[in-house]
Amino acid sequence: ANGYELGGIESGKQQNADGVPFKAIREDVLNHFRKGGLLIMNWTMPHYNGNAELLEEYTKQVAKYLDTLQDGYGIKAPVVLNLLPIDGKAWYCQLSKDEYIELYKKLQDLLEDNDVTNVVYGYSETYKPGKKLMERYPDHQIDVINVTYLQTRNAIRLPLYQQSIKEIITQALPFAQEHNNAFGMTTGIESIG
């Protein structure tokens, strides 16, 4: 599985929020697709300040980019698209549960209006020890649930890590099963380097 951030494409930037050129992402996606790999994309959308036209334009730009993810035969690479991943840092994490779900569904509708056909929708959430998971789950055309849990290289604590993994699996796996979703987990150490 390869994962990519789409943040920046909606504003016409050449690189994503992590500094990776979108052209390089496209090439890597198509390479990975040819090898049968799983492709995961997060869209950490910038604040649109309630401007419906801007939201539509942002979504249109994402749709255009997703449409370019096709091989020489016109076969589009299928992507798990995590809209608005919950990390506790992005502006939309401050929305109420209902506002978040409404925005998530609006983005799905806008992508559908833009004829996006190569995505399955994912819900992605970052776990914080002691935090209840899945409170903002949109329950609307979601196929994949992903939970991310990373420790920092300066604070690696194995007992906390082991306990947290147990809590994630105890909370998220049955939830995914009840909702007929595939379950994935991203885990490791943040900012190695």
Regions found by a protein language model. Give the residues of each.
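Glycoside hydrolase catalytic-domain groove-lining segments
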Residues: 130-192
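Extracytoplasmic, non-cytosolic globular domains
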Residues: 95-128, 138-144, 150, 169-176
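Intrinsically disordered, low-complexity regions enriched in small/polar residues
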Residues: 6, 24, 45, 50, ...
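Substrate-binding cleft of extracellular glycoside hydrolase catalytic domains
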Residues: 7-117
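Structural recognition of the beta-strand scaffold that forms the well-ordered cores
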Residues: 1-6, 38-43, 78-83, 120-123, ...
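Aromatic-lined carbohydrate-recognition surfaces of secreted/lumenal glycan-active proteins
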Residues: 78-85, 104-131, 180-192
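Solvent-exposed loop/turn segments at secondary-structure junctions
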Residues: 8-11, 46-48, 85-89, 126-131, ...
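Short, acidic/polar
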Residues: 1, 21-28, 128-137
